[in-house]
Amino acid sequence: MTVTDINPATGAAVAELNETDLAGMPERMQRARAAQRQWAAKSFKERARHIELMRRYIVDRAEDLAATVSDSNGKTRIDALATEVLPCALACNWYAKNAGKVLGPQKRAAGHLLFANKRTEVSHLPLGVVGIISPWNYPLSIPFGEIVMALMAGNAVLLKVAAATPAVGRAIERILDAGELPEGLFQHIVGSGSKVATAFFENGIDKLFFTGSVPAGKTLMAQAAQTLTPVSLELGGNDAMIVLADADLERATNGAAWAGYQNAGQSCGGVERIYVEAAVYDDFVERL
């Protein structure tokens, strides 16, 4: 079977990708684990070199990546640049520079006299193979940030992007290819989210990141409980904006309109409620 990526603004086909044969998931997992062992043996500095190659690719092809996101997802080119492409480049930069500080071994003082002659150290070990099921509303920046975090922590990654935006998944593949990673360390999977999630759990995924709806999140958490698989679920938000009496109302109203309607309102951090101090309420509403 094939999955067709449709431009929501024009109805034109953007790309057509073959669905991944999930019968091959055991073999995919084996390749990921073999690559992960090789990758985990690298230092943070060595991993960062690969991430830097990805950052350069993103910067050099920023316009092309923004166009792919815009055509696949429907958001404007400027939104695609600002909320998708730029965050990916920034993520590469920050995690490459800081992962060693955050995840490196940390010494701890003895908490009891009995352990005064002991040395205590906290070590953050890789999980192994991390699965990611990402949403359509931010099809590049959300999964890519999770990918970079997982890689810098020494993990392999299996990615399943939203069924509505497979062209962006292919673009992510190209970014990862630019990183010159070990074969099998990153794999892009095309198909149904529920079927892929089941295949992940059945084949021993070590952690799952999911961004999507509350009902889907509940289903995944119930599945994960059967194997005690750790999950990280981001299931939307109900975000408030607060406007105080001393606020610049022109700036506040512009910000409120953008935050509420950017990406057609399909944003987990979009403004859905506004609390305005009584003294400026009428003026704020009129401006808005």
Language-model segments: which ranges?
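N-terminal Rossmann-like NAD(P)+-binding subdomain of aldehyde/semialdehyde dehydrogenases
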Residues: 1-118
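A structured beta-alpha segment of the ubiquitous adenosine-cofactor-binding alpha/beta core
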Residues: 119-120, 187-206
